[in-house]
Amino acid sequence: NRSGITSVDLEKVNFNERSGFKLVDLSGHFVLNPKKIKLEKFVFKTPKTALNCKGIAFNYKDLDDLNDFVNAVYIEGSIQQSKIDFKDLSYFVPSLQSIERTIDFSGNLKGSINNLFVEDLNLSVSPLSYFKGDVDFKGLTDLENCLIYLDIHNCQTSKLDLESINLEKFGLKNNLKLPVELERLGVVKLKGKL
């Protein structure tokens, strides 16, 4: 329109894709203007995944910033309790196809993709393994040199849970092998800053 603002309301968009991917619900209010893309009350659901976003904004100085999305676009958002199943991700990242795991999460995002701060992150991969705290990523797009700062409010896991993650499916040569002595510790709890 003339003001440069486009607004769209989606309500319960769904489809079955030929590959087997099934979208049960795509809903939300979307706004695009010369400085921002904003999603409010965003819902993305499949039979195994549910992403619920109170609001998320992608802010930029001008549309040219979208060409350098990972550095030039500033993200602010709040994600309510959500879950992602790796089977659903595998439609977009085929190497994840054989991973049978669901991740539950919520948190608040601030920053660019490359330098992202996640506040009040609640992340759970099993009833025994979870993380609650803040995470600050510096250089996230260069994983080999990425710095990760953790403010751990509450974290717990066990040797068996960590070893159950099949790292070979993430492209690494070997799965995690921890010393037998750690098994005697049972469930390990952590708090602090790293």
Residue ranges of predicted features:
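Short, T/G/N/S-enriched strand-turn elements that build extracellular solenoid repeat scaffolds
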Residues: 55, 135-136
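Conserved two-metal-ion catalytic palm core of "right-hand" nucleic acid polymerases
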Residues: 69, 134-135
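A compact, surface-exposed functional segment
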Residues: 140
